C-alpha cells in the first residue's frame, strides 16, 4: 500500500505556513491462519516526513503478532462445553511519531535580525548596548522519529458459551522523545535560545480486563452485561534537566506530569 499526502493550508501569515504539508509512506501486511488454530501477521511501514532533515526523514516500523486458538485443538474437546474458547496471543512492534511540537521544520534554525538591543558589554556604569542578529532556535539536523517499542500479550476466554473474558497486558518503551534541552547553563549565552532534540525516554505499563456476559433466556428476552477495568502506569526513564537540579525535583523516576508541592 502506497500513500502520499500533500496538504495545502492556504495560509499566508508566513512563508513557512504557506508551504504545503507533505508525507509519504509504504505499508505491507502478511497474514496467515492455519485451521483457525495458528495465526500469524506481519506488518511493516516505511514512512517519510517533512519534520526531519535529509538523512533522518525515513523510518522503518515493523511489527509481528502470533496467536494460538487452543480450544480448537483435539485435546480440548472434553472441556469445550465449559471453556468454549481459549486463545492466547502476543504482538511486538515499532511505532513512529513525527508530530514533534507545533513548529514545522523544528530542525531548522530561527534567526532574529531585528533584535534591538541584542548585546550589552562593559562593566558597572560603563556599558554599551549593540544591535545584531540573535538565534531564537539552534539548528539540529539530527532530529529524528520518536519510536515506541510496544509489547502486548493477551488471553481471550469464553465460559459456557456466555461469559467472555479478555485480558491484555502491555508495555511500551517510547524513546527519542522530542524535548527542549535544559542542561546548558545560561552563562554560555543560550538563555533565550531554544535547543531541541530527541532527549527523553518514557516507559508505559499496564493491563486491560473486559467482561461480557450474554444469555438468551427465551425467544423474547435476553440479558447482556459488560464491564471493563484498566490499570496504567508510566515512568520517565530519561529527561534532559538543568545541571545541579536537586533529586527531589528531577523528572526521572517519576510519572509524567507529576505535581510538586508540600504535603499537608
Model-derived regions: residue spans:
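Conserved small-residue
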Residues: 104, 214-264
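Short loop/turn motifs that connect adjacent beta-strands in outer-membrane beta-barrel proteins
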Residues: 37, 71-86, 162, 216-223, ...
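Flexible, surface-exposed loop regions and adjacent strand-edge segments
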Residues: 12-17, 57-63, 105-112, 182-191, ...
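Transmembrane beta-strands of outer-membrane beta-barrel proteins
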Residues: 1, 40-42, 62, 81-90, ...
